[in-house]
Amino acid sequence: MIGIGSSLLFDRRSGKGGSPIPQPDVYYDLSLKDNSSPTRNIIDDLSGNGHDAEIFNAAYTESSGYRSDGAFVFDSIDDYAIMQNVTKGFKTLFMEVIPSLTTDKSGFLYDQRVGRTSFGISISLNHIAYNTYNWGGVTYINGKLNTTMNGKEVYLKHQIITIVNGTDLKPQKVVLGGDIGLSGYFSNMALYKLIGFYDELTPLQIEKVINDYKLKYD
């Protein structure tokens, strides 16, 4: 397993420190590259499962590329990334992210929708944050179940989004920074980490992932 310490693996398998969690099926840490990296257009999957993501149209500047605080910024114009070798949808997904660097800018942060099933993560101003396209699922913000906070309250905030959805149908593609049809719903997010599981995690497991992977929020 790439990028995950052996002691941490032991703790998870043994259940030490609380509810055990499965190994991630995809894991990105955007702080590991910069705009001069030879493979800057590839987000490496640190889980070892081959779900690298290819970045398209980035200018590789602080406003469209990697920036010094460890994030990758999508410019909301045409930047996006596509996850590779996806055979089914993730049932639990974590994003450490600033969802939009400008106010009143909607768009998709992540999309694995199959028709009106599974989920996409988007900012919709007058709807429950990140839940508009999460059919049959639940949404957590900073580890807490969200049923009241709406989209206009999440701009500019460094936060942890967690989606739990029981549908694992294979999507046509998995897109970061835009919608699955690449039809213009690009986001202006700053993405720090992304972690996905084929399992539905419990609230205790969600808390453990946040702690183990040192996901941060304001």
Feature roles, as predicted:
Residues M1-D78, S124, A190-K193, I206-D218:
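Extracytoplasmic low-complexity segments
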Residues S106-G136:
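Glycan-recognition/cleft segments
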Residues S14-I21, V73-F94, Y110-V114, F119, ...:
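Short surface loop/edge beta-strand patches of beta-sandwich-type extracellular domains
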